[in-house]
A protein has these predicted regions:
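Active-site-proximal loop/helix segment associated with metal-binding centers of metalloenzymes
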Residues: 26-28, 50-102
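Short, solvent-exposed polar/charged micro-motifs at secondary-structure junctions
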Residues: 54-60, 143, 178-179, 199-200
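Glycine-centered loop/turn motifs
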Residues: 51, 193-198
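Short acidic/glycine-rich loop or secondary-structure boundary segments that cap or lie
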Residues: 21, 55, 62, 68-71, ...
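Cap/insert and terminal regions of metallo-dependent hydrolase folds
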Residues: 1, 10, 86-95, 99-194
């Protein structure tokens, strides 16, 4: 739909985004959740195989390998490999670094590999922490707003506090997890919602 109304915008996607990706719903067969393969050859789509500098201000980096950092909510995400359903390796995910003057910002999606691991990769690339992060944290699974155990949220808050950033999050973070993280990181959490406008 987007490409049918915008004839100029470039779309950058990791090549793996066009793979056979599926979601699991309890008691149901795997449901295809990937992209239409026909879009891969669209003239406005640029397929990437790793990190990519769009220009001096915008830099994309793909998924990060973070053993143990991915959230339990990922268990419903699958991909097809050699005719078998396996856990999604999340190689289709990417994050965006925005460089504006002396400010640095991180924009991620649902951070399925763990926002803390993505922040660590940001620091490796930039040599510093971001000033602000806009991302889902993928702490609540499909169809539930239940938060992870408090010890898991406390451990995440400790990782986040080491980066001295302000965090704007919503969607897959879940309301109860957001409220608890706001208590653990006072003054450093902001809620993202559709139509929100703010200055960084």
């Amino acid at each position: 739909a987007f490409l049918s109304v915008n004839k100029k915008a470039r779309v950058f996607a990791q090549r793996a985004a066009f793979g056979p990706l599926y979601g699991l719903d309890e008691g149901q067969p795997p449901r295809f959740v990937g992209l239409d393969i026909a879009l891969a050859s669209h003239p406005q789509v640029r397929l990437l195989d790793g990190e990519y500098a769009i220009d001096e201000h915008l830099y994309l980096f793909p998924w990060v390998s973070a053993e143990g950092a991915a959230t339990p909510s990922n268990r419903s995400l699958m991909e097809e490999m050699d005719g078998e359903m396996v856990r999604d390796r999340l190689m289709h995910e990417q994050s965006l670094i925005i460089r504006e003057g002396d400010k640095r910002f991180l924009v991620a999606g649902c951070a399925h590999n763990g926002i803390a691991a993505i922040l660590d990769r940001f620091r490796e690339i930039e040599g510093r922490s971001p000033d602000a992060v806009l991302s889902g944290f993928h702490l609540s699974g499909p169809g539930t707003s239940a938060a992870p155990p408090d010890e898991a949220l406390s451990a995440l808050a400790a990782r986040l506090s080491a980066h001295h950033a302000t965090y704007y999050t919503g969607h897959c973070t879940g309301q109860s997890a957001y409220e608890r993280l706001s208590e653990l990181l006072p003054g450093r959490m902001g809620h993202l919602s559709a139509g929100l406008s703010f200055s960084l």
